[in-house]
């Protein structure tokens, strides 16, 4: 049985903060998350959040026993049963939270429902929705029929804003934390010079939920020894020490999100992390170069969605962009290249939630393929 994250005692921390656990639901290998040296099932961690949401809703509207529940078209996972596993886990958690009548509804379709509700007079029969959120990239193609619609195709891949944030962390932060630096230390009869083994730190730094596990001697000892030797690059390892000791990865990712948002409206922005005395300027052009490979995946997934619908790009009347990452100018550019003059932006951060509420009110259901 695999446990996600090293089984080390984290009793010195005030708590463990988890984000993006939805991304783990479809991974059969991820069965437990460690909290204060105790393994918790994913379902056990998700249930209290869902219970709190239900109770908050009931405080305003009364008893809630059923709901339309959003999910990505394809959960992240390693096999063909990832969606089945994820929906089973999610359904179990909702059940424990008191939501017994469950109607799973794909998130891009929910976003499209929200758009059509707000824009009933929008012209066009065929609508394509791109929902580019934090963890997944989802698509749907709908055909409008009066006041109703039919689902022509859905598609989704495991790519989201969180993946772009990790790329920025690697490209911008790693060189400033000691990657590529030399490590000189005294051997038995001579001085030994090697590259500092930064690769051992990389995955834990960019997965901030488990960055705290770097507070073990196997990681901290070489960092402190490298600082003690002095010389060029010492400040970089002092930064690495501070990131580890003060568990700063989450804070840095928050600053990266701010940087990314700024580059959606201006050509140059600054990543400012005063906690480790670091400022890095980044141009939109360089940002787009860094995320060139994910952008290619976006383009390929977009074209695959149109192909699955049995359509050509010219057959699409309305192209709806939603989700925070849809605001990235390069993503907008991909849409405009293929659907010039037909791209609209809609409520990037709450369209899915609004659409789920509307779909539930109207009794809209989605039959699982």
Features from the language model and the residues they span:
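Nucleotide/phosphate-binding catalytic cleft detector across ATP-hydrolyzing
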Residues: 9-129, 232-285
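Gly/Thr-rich phosphate-binding beta-strand-loop-beta motif of the actin/hexokinase/Hsp70
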Residues: 13-14, 117-150, 321
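Phosphate/pyrophosphate-binding loops at sites that engage ATP/ADP/AMP, CoA/4′-phosphopantetheine
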Residues: 53-67, 299-317
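Glycine-rich beta-strand-to-loop/alpha-helix junction loops that act as flexible
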Residues: 71-72, 318-325
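Conserved phosphate-binding/catalytic loops in two-lobed NTP-binding clefts
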Residues: 97-105, 314, 332-357
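Phosphate-binding glycine-rich/basic clefts of nucleotide- and phosphate-handling proteins
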Residues: 144-275
């Amino acid at each position: 049985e695999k446990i996600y994250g090293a089984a080390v005692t984290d009793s010195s921390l005030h708590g463990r903060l988890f984000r993006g656990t939805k991304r783990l639901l479809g991974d059969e290998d991820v069965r437990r998350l460690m909290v204060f040296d105790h393994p918790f099932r994913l379902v056990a961690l998700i249930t209290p959040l869902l219970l709190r949401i239900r109770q908050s809703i009931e405080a305003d509207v009364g008893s809630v026993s059923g709901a339309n529940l959003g999910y990505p078209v394809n959960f992240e996972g390693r096999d063909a049963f990832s969606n089945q596993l994820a929906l089973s886990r999610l359904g179990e958690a909702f059940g424990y939270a008191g939501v017994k009548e469950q109607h799973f509804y794909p998130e891009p379709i929910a976003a499209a429902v929200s758009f059509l509700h707000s824009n009933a007079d929008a012209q066009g029969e065929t609508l394509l929705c791109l929902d580019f959120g934090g963890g997944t990239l989802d698509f749907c193609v709908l055909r409008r029929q009066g006041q109703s619609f039919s689902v022509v195709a859905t598609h989704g891949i495991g790519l989201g804003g969180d993946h772009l944030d990790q790329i920025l962390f690697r490209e911008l932060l790693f060189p400033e934390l000691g990657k590529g630096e030399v490590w000189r230390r005294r051997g038995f009869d001579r001085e030994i010079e090697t590259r500092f083994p930064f690769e051992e730190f990389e995955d834990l730094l960019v997965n901030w939920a488990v960055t705290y596990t770097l507070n073990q001697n196997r990681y901290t000892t070489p960092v402190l020894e490298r600082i003690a030797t002095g010389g060029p690059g010492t400040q970089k390892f002092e930064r690495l020490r501070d990131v580890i000791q003060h568990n700063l990865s989450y804070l840095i990712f928050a600053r990266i999100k701010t940087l990314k948002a700024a580059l959606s409206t201006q050509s140059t922005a600054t990543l400012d992390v005063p906690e480790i005395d670091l400022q890095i300027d980044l141009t939109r052009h360089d940002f787009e170069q860094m995320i060139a490979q994910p952008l290619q995946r976006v383009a390929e997934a977009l074209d695959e969605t149109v192909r699955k619908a049995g359509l050509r790009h010219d057959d699409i009347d309305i192209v709806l962009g939603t989700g925070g990452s849809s605001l990235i100018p390069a993503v907008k550019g991909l849409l405009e290249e293929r659907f010039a003059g037909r791209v609209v932006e809609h409520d990037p951060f709450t369209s899915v939630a609004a659409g789920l509420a509307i779909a539930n009110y109207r009794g809209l259901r989605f039959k699982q393929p």
